[in-house]
Amino acid sequence: SDLQRTWYICYPHEDKAPADVQRGFDVIKESITRAANELKPGKKGWEIDEIARNFIQIKGYEEYPHGLGHQVGRFAHDGGALLGPKWERYGNLPLLEVEEGNVFTIEPRLTIPNYGIATIEEEVLITKDGCEFLSERQNEIYLIR
């Protein structure tokens, strides 16, 4: 219901994405893995956001301008808790705890200089002990040749 994937349009002489694009994609993918590994009932939204946000910045990319993820329910942006930073515009939503049965997106992004934005958006179900991905994760860049 709310997924994003990263695609790269190859030039005629290319058979894969350039190293800078691949590196950005790998950082996004790893940031999702790290956040998901800590996403479980009782965690506050800002704690999960901070994991992905810090990892991306440590890898040398700029901070992304939005929260890591939002709840999904009857609407694309639904529910209470937000996987986001403690920014004024989000109010108390990042301070709320994640609950079993919630569904969240995990959608970090980064800008790859001279190429554009890389992002992946996954959806997860919060389980008793963690989270479960609701669709097959994107593990490689989709290429258009």
Predicted regions located by residue number:
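Active-site neighborhoods and metal-handling regions in enzymes and metal-associated proteins
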Residues: 1-145
